Amino acid sequence: MYMTAREQKLLKHLLLQNRYITVTELAELMQVSTRTIHRELKSIKPLMETVGLTLDKQPGKGLKAVGSPEGKQKLLTDLSYEQHEYSADERKLLILCSLLESQEPVKLYTLAHDLQVTNATVSYDLDELEKWISPFGLTLIRKRGFGIQLIGPENAKRKIVGNLIVNRLDIQMFLEAVELNIKGKTDSSEKMFGVVSKGELLKMERILFQLKEKIAFSLSDSSYIALVVHLTYAIERIKLGETITMEQNELEELMNAKEYSSALEIAGELERAFGVTIPEAEVGYITIHLRSANRKYKTEYKAQEIELETALQTKRLIAFISDKIRMDLTKNYSLYEGLIAHLEPAVSRIKENIEIYNPMKEQIKRDYFLLYMAIEEGVEKYFPGMSFSDDEIAFIVLHFGSALEIKKEEAKVKALVVCSSGIGSSKMLASRLKKELPEIESFDMSSLIELKGKDVQAYDMIVSTVPIPYENIDYIMVSPLLNEEDANQVKQYIKRKIPLILNKKRSSKEEAQQADVPDMLEAAESIGRYMEVIQDVLRHFTLAQLKTNPDHSMLLLELFQQLKKDGLIRDPEKAAVCLAEREKQGGLGIPGTNMALYHLKNDEIVLPFFKMFDLSTPYEVDGMDGNTLRMTRILVMMAPGSLSAEGSEILSAISSAIIESGESMAGFQEEGGQELYQRLNRIFFTWMKEKNIL
């Protein structure tokens, strides 16, 4: 049986659980949407049934794998023999672990063999890995006949163990290893987290556990485990003669830190336990990790011990957020205490370039999007020169979130996306916005003409691919493909509007109404309109050759004359003029391809259709990103001006699918007519399943 890495992980998790688990929990575990989980569950159900297992669904409780223990064990055994398909990130981490562990260069083919991929895949992974390690001051030597070797200072290697490996550790896995060790059931030679031996790691854990009473403060579970891994790796490196260096003035500063005495206590115990000599610089290194660790109790931060600058910055941040969300939090001392307990070690982490991992980051960004954006702006303003990661900001959001009355519903942003036709570039832009800002709750699409009839006050933001000629409409204009600069502009736009958005949501105190049974006649008519447009598109889809000459204006006329022969438009000249006007508003070429998407909604169009044409003469056209490209294939998507909302959704699903991935763009660019028809068929099938129509 073939299973993707995600399906294997999902199935294994279900088999090992003895409790009901919700789809939301699974989505957070897998770091995907709940929709993806539902799709994966459909794939693994048949495999479970082969050994007599079923998925029991209980409303309000979740899912549970039900069946005999023998059936579960059989499937787990099969999974262990299944060829493992590593994700790209997993491969990069495994390569990094191999390079950290090896004192000698590692051959490319050895890595490819171990990861069960091609040499070319490993080469690409190494290119990406170089980007990962560069900020740490590490480089890769890659020479034919020599192999691959990780080069850089010992301090940097220690740091990368924390930032790229420890931050991805599984606390549950660590605790299970400790439990097995207590029961004498662990293999001490096995590697944990790819870089440290399990035996040494568990020995280190016992030592630190015994030292807990002597250490002046309590670490959170994640910080405690991270310290265990850091110190185990440090001891292994010291045994190999690899020690870190530290400037004398930095060391002297650390000696004055309140954590230094605890670091000395730990170092002395490690010298006795492992038979090594720990230099002063290594004691300084331990001090840094203690300073950067999150504490279990906020009361461990005494007012007289807190850096004055950090205290002032924290108070200013609270005042800024209070003003932003129109709620006074400046007198909430519990919030101040909790923030200080997080921010003091956070500032140390940032100064030392030590990252922290927040497994709830994506959910926090979704649930408290506006608060997250406000805090992101606040730390940038009041902690200048310090780069707070998304993980750090998400932790700060939790502190504010617990002190606020901001409900998750208040933080949800609803956007209206506008383009000239409402069926082409608006859906492309919405797709890109979902990728860049998945926290935006929902998107509606509109053409410029439809915008006049929209209640724009029902939306928190309006994003357009074309200038909006109407007065009193606040909007931001970006490219349909939303480059990095555009994405940043949208984020800044949201930050400016946070007070207005929250005020509007709070002022409209409409009570939630019970969901009524829908009008089934209306629902059936709506489904009929969806089906009608799908039929029109599939029945009239073709990939044809179009003989053209170098005159671009003639190209449009020839195109529309062909469409008139097919019975799809009325007046070719009028339609050509309308499309030429549309082209003046912004390029239609799809960047990175040789295609352009010609989309138009106009009364000259008889019915909705999607056609493609290969050109005998390439043309230079403006792309959606403002650059020119050589067009050899035209994608034509058109509809009558009276197209229903359901029809617009169907055509938008196509334009979204075109740019969904590199594979999708390549397919639309290179495939033949029959393959493209099947691709459209799959697009509609997937869309209907997601709409729960099938």
Swiss-Prot record:
Domain of life: Bacteria
Keyword Nucleus: no
Biological process, per Gene Ontology: phosphoenolpyruvate-dependent sugar phosphotransferase system; regulation of DNA-templated transcription
Inactivation phenotype: Cells lacking this gene cannot grow on either mannitol or glucitol as sole carbon source.
Uppermost EC category: transferase
Domain PTS EIIB type-2: 413-502
PTM sites of type Phosphocysteine: C419
Summary of activators and inhibitors of this protein: The regulatory activity of MtlR is modulated by phosphorylation and dephosphorylation of the various MtlR domains. It becomes activated via phosphoryl group transfer from PEP, EI and HPr on the two conserved histidine residues in the PRD 2 domain, whereas phosphorylation of the EIIA-like domain on His-599 by the PTS EIIB-Mtl domain of MtlA inactivates MtlR.
Phosphohistidine PTM sites in chain numbering: H230, H289, H342, H399, H599
One GO MF term attached to the UniProt entry: protein-N(PI)-phosphohistidine-sugar phosphotransferase activity
Catalytic activity: D-mannitol(out) + N(pros)-phospho-L-histidyl-[protein] = D-mannitol 1-phosphate(in) + L-histidyl-[protein]
Signal peptide: none
Induction comment from the UniProt entry of this chain: Up-regulated by mannitol or glucitol.
EC number: 2.7.1.197
Keyword flag Transmembrane: no
Sorted UniProt keywords: Activator, DNA-binding, Kinase, Phosphoprotein, Repeat, Transcription, Transcription regulation, Transferase
Start and end residues of each PRD domain: 195-300, 305-410
Domain spans labelled PTS EIIA type-2: 536-683
Pfam family, one: PTS_IIB
Family in the record: Belongs to the transcriptional antiterminator BglG family.
Function: Positively regulates the expression of the mtlAFD operon involved in the uptake and catabolism of mannitol.
PANTHER family for this protein: CRYPTIC BETA-GLUCOSIDE BGL OPERON ANTITERMINATOR (PTHR30185), TRANSCRIPTIONAL REGULATOR MTLR (PTHR30185:SF18)
Protein name stated in the entry: Transcriptional regulator MtlR
